Amino acid sequence: MATDLSEAEPVHHKALPLLTGTQLIHTDKLSEKAEDDTMPIRRSVNSSRETPPKSKPAEGGEEVKADAEATSEESASAGEEQENETLPAAAPSEAEQPKEPENEEKGETKSSVETKKDDKDQSKEKEKKVKKTIPAWATLSASQLARAQKQTQMAATSRPKMDAILTEAIKACFQKSGASVVAIRKYIIHKYPSLELERRGYLLKQALKRELERGIIRQVKGKGASGSFVVVSNAGKTVQKARDRKKSTSVSTPEQQVKLEDILPLAFTRLCEPKEASYSLIKKYVSQYYPKLKVDIRPQLLKNALQRAVEKGQLEQITGKGASGTFQLKKSGEKPLLGGTLMEDAILSAIAAMNEPKTCSTTALKKYILENHPGTNSNFQVHLLKRTLQRCEKNGWLEQISGKGFSGTFQLCFPYYPSPDVLYPEKQQDEDSEESQEEEEEESEEEEESEEEESEEEEPPPKKRMQKRPPPKSRSRAPPMKRRESKPKPRKTPAAHQGKAKPPPKVKTPVKKAKPAAPAIKKPSGGSSSKKPTASGRKEVKPSAKGKSAMRKSLRAKK
């Protein structure tokens, strides 16, 4: 029994682990099923690890027992590990599922960013194409122009043509004998410094040659690019006739040729309100365009004029005291109160031109352009104004301060200081007419004086000849009479008494008596100089005869 029990014990011991092993295997299978249900991806990954333990129990009994004990311990730990792993494995699986939409969102954001970049590149390319340029009407000093040229480019299309500048200079510098090349050159250098005519003098020579060939100007003095020139008055009419003959469908008018881009700065200058400027700017403008007033040499004249205008109420002093500070124009309606004398006109044009910044509303611009430059169609002109404002804003010439689109207020981005001829052409025409009248009067006076001088020069020569002719006749006739009359009488005296020397002292006494006859010689003005000596000679001869008779009487008495 002992043996049976001893033999039976190991069997019993062996049977227990087998049962437990089968149970464990069953539990493993159940766990695998659970894994199959929950984690299909994990099964495929760990299938190589799970399959080998199934073949191991079939190899041998003892190995199975040892393995069963080991697996019992490992299975317990593996079960816990699997349970622990299932939780984090489920988490990444759940996390992996939402990663796909995130990737899709990222792809969409990337595509949107790329499209934005493309749009930015296109906009940059457009900005590069439309570069800011300096307009031709901008009034800049040499230093300001150099700075601006570094940042921007000069506008090539809107730059004024040399031919038009030349005709303007000839008209401005015109005098009696035409406009000299030196004066024309100075005018262009002073008014159009951007042309750099000091360095590029060939521009003026070429323009003179072209205009001479076209017949627009005429050379009065000199040859080539020197001398004086005059604008031909009928040249414009002939050019217009030729254009009318050539063109059959469209008729070109000067209003259509004028661009609104060139009109806008002057419109801003006239319409900007209120107009004000400092004393330094007024002085600079007056000294530049009114050299006759000599403000640089006599600044007190300008100061006194400004103070007088403030006292009269024609100007308002906003800042400063006395003649320093900022002055503002006062108006009665649309006309300024200041004006009349040359100094007042100079101050008026200086304040209107040097006012900065120059701003204007679109409504005022519309009104100004429709009144002064109506064109063929008013609606089309307004449309052109809208387009020019947009183009000028893109070029950087204008800036919109308020409003949007074609409404609000615009401002000039560059300084613009027009000359008095451009700002007030009517006054300049009046001044030119007055100057021409004065010149005509002076010319007429000079002609009259020259005619009088010529007549005086022509008349006196015959008088001088008449005066010169009679004296030689009287001289030629009178002297021989003297000699004939005087010669025989002295001959008689020595014949009567040759040896007596007493008569000479007695001859002196009658000479003394002849003194009262001296004033009688001075009195006759009409008598000639030749008659005077003859009369004196006769008087001298008479006393000599009386002396002789007295001597004879004395001799007789002695006898």
Swiss-Prot record:
A molecular function GO annotation: nucleosome binding
Short sequence motif named PxVxL motif, residue ranges: 256-260
Pfam family, one: Linker_histone
Location in or out of the cell: Nucleus; Chromosome
Transmembrane segments: none
InterPro entries with a match to the protein in the record: Histone_H1/H5_H15, WH-like_DNA-bd_sf, WH_DNA-bd_sf
Classification via SUPFAM superfamilies: Winged helix' DNA-binding domain
Biased composition annotated in UniProt, kind: Low complexity: 516-533
GO BP terms in the entry: heterochromatin organization; nucleosome assembly
Region (Disordered): 1-132, 421-559
CDD domains: H15 (cd00073)
Compositionally biased tracts (Acidic residues): 429-459
GO cellular component: chromosome; nucleosome; nucleus
Compositional bias ranges of the Basic and acidic residues kind: 51-68, 96-128
Annotated Basic residues bias: 463-515, 549-559
Matches recorded under PROSITE patterns: H15
UniProt free text on domains: A central region that included the first H15 (linker histone H1/H5 globular) domain binds at the entry/exit site of the nucleosomal DNA.
Protein name per the record: Heterochromatin protein 1-binding protein 3
GN (gene name): HP1BP3
